[in-house]
Amino acid sequence: MQEITRVGVDLAKNVIQIHAVDAQGKTVINRQLPRGKFKEWCIQLPVGCLVAMEACGGAHYWARTLRSLGIEVRLVAPHLVTAYRLQGKSGKNDANDAAAVCEAA
């Protein structure tokens, strides 16, 4: 399995969509996690992996939590994510949003 270097996260009420890529930008993981499993999953990420999420109220909580674990976190402004989302992805859904956040980071 390729080593994950960057993760895009779309936060929702009950689940968190993750889109992880390797150093070449190839998708390694694209799946949903229950909110309760997200922190456990992030703890297993390789050192130096970047976790990016669209800036919103819940993102600040997760950013603080992950940074306390030594994980590099980047909050991406929503207008920047929209620009990537519009580049050929059809429709707005959690998977497309997570991929757009990953690319924008």
Cite the ranges covered by each PLM segment:
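Phosphate- and other anionic-substrate recognition elements at nucleic-acid/protein interfaces
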Residues: 1-105
